[in-house]
């Protein structure tokens, strides 16, 4: 029986790269890996209202550079930058090194897989009908420029006695085409009936050529210009 591979892991070093970008040997590798996990856990737990999509960690020399991609950067920065300074000090205590924080605004959270999945999970926890939440997310993504989207919800949906999986798809979502720019994320909804799992695939076009930084570059271009990155012409 065939199984779906993780679209992000499948495309690493093709048109995507890692969210932790550093090199270490021996004991330093394990220490830095644990630090990265603790940083991400703390950021997501401490700032649930900021709509954080991902945290990218780079370690040039003895500096730790943390980039937080969020739909509500004002929640992270706080009044006159007070909250971001507290966050920087806390992360510095966790890593034992100087921390540089960079906040990147996500202008279109409706086409960000992580934020879409988390939004559906939040609605399920508030007892919103799962079909309504899925359809609303699909319509918003397609309206704002996604070329295709697929959403899976699994668990005791609607309080049913037997767990099942429901899915909804619109547009085209290629799973095996490596040049496809497919954003993928998972989320959990902790309901009164148990845990429901949400998976989201969003197809944003194709990236031609071998460029591991292409996805990040397109995302940054979209934030600075405020327009959807155009699909590259076939050569």
From Swiss-Prot:
Which of UniProt's keywords are assigned here? Ribonucleoprotein, Ribosomal protein, RNA-binding, rRNA-binding
The UniProt entry, under SMART domains, shows: KH (SM00322)
Q: Does the keyword Glycosyltransferase apply?
A: no
Q: Name one GO molecular function term.
A: structural constituent of ribosome
InterPro entries noted in UniProt: KH_dom, KH_dom-like_a/b, KH_dom_type_2, KH_sf_prok-type, Ribosomal_S3_C_sf, Ribosomal_uS3_bac-typ, Ribosomal_uS3_C, Ribosomal_uS3_CS
Indicate the segments forming the KH type-2 domain, all copies: 39-107
Q: Which Pfam families match?
A: KH_2, Ribosomal_S3_C
Question: What's a GO biological-process term for it?
Answer: translation
Report the GO terms under cellular component: cytosolic small ribosomal subunit
Subunit structure, briefly? Part of the 30S ribosomal subunit. Forms a tight complex with proteins S10 and S14.
Q: Provide the function of this protein.
A: Binds the lower part of the 30S subunit head. Binds mRNA in the 70S ribosome, positioning it for translation.
What protein family does this chain belong to?
Belongs to the universal ribosomal protein uS3 family.
Stated name of the protein: Small ribosomal subunit protein uS3
Provide the species name: Sphingopyxis alaskensis (strain DSM 13593 / LMG 18877 / RB2256)
Q: Which gene encodes it?
A: rpsC
């Amino acid at each position: 029986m065939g199984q779906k591979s993780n679209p992000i892991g499948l495309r690493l070093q093709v048109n995507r790269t890692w969210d932790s970008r550093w090199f270490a040997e021996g004991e330093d590798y394990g220490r830095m890996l644990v630090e990265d996990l603790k940083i991400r856990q703390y950021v997501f737990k401490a700032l649930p209202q900021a709509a954080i999509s991902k945290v990218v960690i780079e370690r040039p020399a003895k500096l730790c550079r943390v980039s937080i991609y969020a739909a509500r950067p004002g929640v992270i920065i706080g009044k006159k930058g007070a909250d971001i300074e507290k966050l920087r000090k806390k992360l510095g205590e966790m890593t034992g090194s100087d921390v540089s924080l960079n906040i990147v605004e996500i202008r279109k959270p409706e086409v960000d897989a992580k934020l879409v999945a988390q939004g559906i999970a939040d609605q399920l926890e508030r007892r919103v009908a799962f079909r309504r939440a899925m359809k609303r997310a699909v319509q918003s993504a397609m309206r704002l420029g996604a070329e295709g989207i697929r959403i899976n919800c699994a668990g005791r949906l609607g309080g049913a006695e037997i767990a099942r999986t429901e899915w909804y798809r619109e547009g085209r979502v290629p799973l095996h085409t490596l040049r496809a720019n497919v954003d993928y994320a998972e989320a959990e909804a902790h309901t009164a009936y148990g845990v429901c799992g949400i998976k989201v695939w969003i197809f944003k076009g194709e990236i031609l050529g071998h460029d591991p930084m292409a996805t990040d570059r397109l995302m940054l271009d979209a934030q600075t210009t405020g327009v959807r990155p155009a699909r590259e012409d076939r050569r």
